[in-house]
Amino acid sequence: MAATLLDVCAVVPAAGFGRRMQTECPKQYLSIGNKTILEHSVHALLAHPRVTRVVIAISPGDSRFAELPLAQHPQVTVVDGGDERADSVLAGLRAAGDAQWVLVHDAARPCLHQDDLARLLSLSETSRTGGILAAPVRDTMKRAEPGKAAIAHTVERTDLWHALTPQFFPRELLHDCLSRALNEGATITDEASALEYCGFHPQLVEGRADNIKVTRPEDLALAEFYLTRTI
C-alpha cells in the first residue's frame, strides 16, 4: 500500500484545565460559535481523509465531554488521561491500535488549516522520524535576567521556530521515546522534545501563524475571528 494511503490515528490530550484562561470551565470546552474549542480542533483533524480515528484523552473526572455530540462520533475514542501531557499522549498511543503513524494535536488549537495538515501528513512518504508544524520566529526575542523582568540580552532569531501542532510521528517511535524520556526524568514540553531527547531530529514543516493555541482570554476572540473569516 502506498504511504500516502496509510490511515492515521490522531491523539488529542484534553485532560488539562488551562488556569491562564481565568475561567472555571476548562478552555477546551469554551465555545466558539456553536461548537466547543475541542470540537473545532477534532473536526479539523477528521476533515482529512487519512485521519480515520481520533483518540481523546480526558480527565477521569471530566463530566463535560459526554454531553458533546462528539462523544457519539463513530471515529472518536475516549481514554482517561494523566496528570501530565506526556501521560495523556501515552494513554492515547496505547489506544491507537496498529496505526503506523500518529498525529498529536492540542485540544485548544482550533484553527488548523487543511493545507498545513496535508503537507505535514506527506512526511510519511519521505521521513522515518516525522516532524511538526512550526512557524518561523518573526519578532525580536529577548532573554530575561534570571528571576527578573529585565532584559539580559537579545536572542538571535535566525533559525528559531515556534513549535505548533499537530506533530506527526511513527507510533512506535513516539511511544518508545516518550516512555524512555519519562522513565529517565527528562523534561518533555511537546512530543518532538521526546524524540530530540532520544537523538532524533524531526523535520520542521512551515505552518500558518494563525494556527494559534487558546491559552489566555484574549486568544478566544482571535480564534473566533480566524474561524469565521473566509480565506
Curated annotation (Swiss-Prot):
The keyword Cell membrane does not apply. It catalyses: 2-C-methyl-D-erythritol 4-phosphate + CTP + H(+) = 4-CDP-2-C-methyl-D-erythritol + diphosphate. GO terms for molecular function: 2-C-methyl-D-erythritol 4-phosphate cytidylyltransferase activity. Pathway: Isoprenoid biosynthesis; isopentenyl diphosphate biosynthesis via DXP pathway; isopentenyl diphosphate from 1-deoxy-D-xylulose 5-phosphate: step 2/6. NCBIfam families: ispD (TIGR00453). Gene3D superfamilies: Spore Coat Polysaccharide Biosynthesis Protein SpsA, Chain A (3.90.550.10). The keyword NAD does not apply. This is 2-C-methyl-D-erythritol 4-phosphate cytidylyltransferase.
